[in-house]
Amino acid sequence: MTQTIFMVGARGAGKTTIGKALAQALGYRFIDTDLFMQQTLQSSVAEIVAREGWDGFRLRESMALQTVTAPKTVVATGGGAVLSHDNRTFMRQHGMVIYLRASANVLAERLAEDPEDAQRPSLTGKPIVEEMLDVLASREPLYQEVAHHVLDATQPPEEVVEQILHILADEKVK
């Protein structure tokens, strides 16, 4: 199997950590769409949002998603990539979509520990746990809709990678 593997989930779910480890295990390339945009535009996510608003950021996110999609690539998407129906359709048609699911409390803990994630602009202006509850309430149905497979992202990353490798092996057999 050489199709693109898309990692979806909220900020702090482990898309980058698990995506990198999965790509290494498979001998695939790894791309984080947020980092791709930051490098391409030479701006942080906060700067892009300040300059272009969330709508402009989401448009760039969609373009980045299509640009980086290629065989033998693991793509960590931005948490809001699923907000676009076109993105959800694109990912389902062009690869396998893995939803890394975690509770708002777990996500908030992880975000509080990660100084890089702390620099992301707030989506709601609320404290992080409340924000994650709101974000998950609105996005959970979209993550579920787009996902070919839903995995518990509260497990250690190496266990999640093993589960994905088993899924890929099963898909190959079919």
Swiss-Prot record:
Enzyme Commission number(s): 2.7.1.71
Record-listed ATP binding positions: G12, A13, G14, K15, T16, T17, R120, Q155
Statement: the UniProt record of this protein carries the keyword Transferase: yes
Pathway as given in its UniProt record: Metabolic intermediate biosynthesis; chorismate biosynthesis; chorismate from D-erythrose 4-phosphate and phosphoenolpyruvate: step 5/7
Subcellular location as annotated: Cytoplasm
List of residues binding substrate: D34, R58, G79, R139
First-level EC class: transferase
Taxonomic superkingdom: Bacteria
Binding site for Mg(2+): T16, D32
SUPFAM superfamilies documented for this protein: P-loop containing nucleoside triphosphate hydrolases (SSF52540)
NCBIfam families: PRK03731.1
Quaternary structure note: Monomer.
Function: Catalyzes the specific phosphorylation of the 3-hydroxyl group of shikimic acid using ATP as a cosubstrate.
Name this polypeptide is given: Shikimate kinase 2
